[in-house]
C-alpha cells in the first residue's frame, strides 16, 4: 500500500471543497440534484482524482447523477484550474459511494439481531 503524502491529502481536500461549491452554485443540470461529495482521492502526480459521491435518493438517482457529473466533468475541471494553483489539474472520475448504504443495512441487521435475543 503506498504511503499517503500530506500534500496529496491537502490537495484532495481542497479539490473536494471547490468541487462541492462548484456543483452547488454553478451546475444547473437537474440530473445531479442533491448529491454529497464524500471524499476525493488524488494520485501522487495529480493527474487523476476519484471523486466519491452519494445521492439523496439512493441507487435510483445514482445513475442519473453519474451521467450528469460525467457530462460536467470538463467544465468542473476548467473551473478548478482557476481556483487551485497546480501545474496539473487532475482529470475527474466520479464514483458512487455505496459505503453509507452498506452501513445503514449493517445497522439494521444489528438492530434486528439485538431485538431477537
UniProtKB/Swiss-Prot annotation:
Gene Ontology MF terms: ribosomal small subunit binding
Q: Which GO terms describe its biological process?
A: maturation of SSU-rRNA
Q: Which InterPro entries match?
A: KH_dom-like_a/b, RbfA, RbfA_dom_sf, Ribosome-bd_factorA_CS
**TM ranges:** none
State the compartments where it is located. Answer: Cytoplasm
SUPFAM superfamilies in the record, alphabetically? Answer: Ribosome-binding factor A, RbfA
GO cellular component: a single term = cytosol
- Please tell me where this protein is predominantly located: cytoplasm
Keyword Cytoplasm listed? The answer is: yes
Print the keywords alphabetically.
Answer: Cytoplasm, Ribosome biogenesis
Question: Does the keyword section mention Cytoplasm?
Answer: yes
Q: Which Pfam families match?
A: RBFA (PF02033)
Record text on subunit structure and interactions: Monomer. Binds 30S ribosomal subunits, but not 50S ribosomal subunits or 70S ribosomes.
Protein family: Belongs to the RbfA family.
The free-text function statement in the UniProt record for this protein reads: One of several proteins that assist in the late maturation steps of the functional core of the 30S ribosomal subunit. Associates with free 30S ribosomal subunits (but not with 30S subunits that are part of 70S ribosomes or polysomes). Required for efficient processing of 16S rRNA. May interact with the 5'-terminal helix region of 16S rRNA.
Can you say what this protein is called? Ribosome-binding factor A
Question: Which species does the entry assign this protein to?
Answer: Nitrosomonas eutropha (strain DSM 101675 / C91 / Nm57)
Amino acid at each position: 500500500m503506498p504511503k499517503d503524502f500530506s500534500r496529496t491529502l491537502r490537495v484532495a481536500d481542497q479539490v473536494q471543497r471547490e468541487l462541492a461549491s462548484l456543483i452547488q452554485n454553478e451546475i444547473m443540470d437537474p440530473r445531479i440534484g442533491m448529491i454529497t461529495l464524500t471524499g476525493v482521492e488524488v494520485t501522487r502526480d495529480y493527474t487523476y482524482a476519484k471523486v466519491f459521491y452519494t445521492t439523496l435518493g439512493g441507487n435510483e438517482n445514482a445513475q442519473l447523477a453519474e451521467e450528469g457529473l460525467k457530462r460536467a466533468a470538463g467544465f468542473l475541471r476548467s473551473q478548478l484550474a482557476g481556483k487551485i494553483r497546480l501545474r496539473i489539474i487532475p482529470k475527474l472520475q466520479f464514483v458512487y459511494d455505496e459505503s453509507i448504504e452498506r452501513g445503514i443495512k449493517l445497522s439494521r441487521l444489528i438492530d434486528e439481531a439485538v431485538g431477537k435475543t
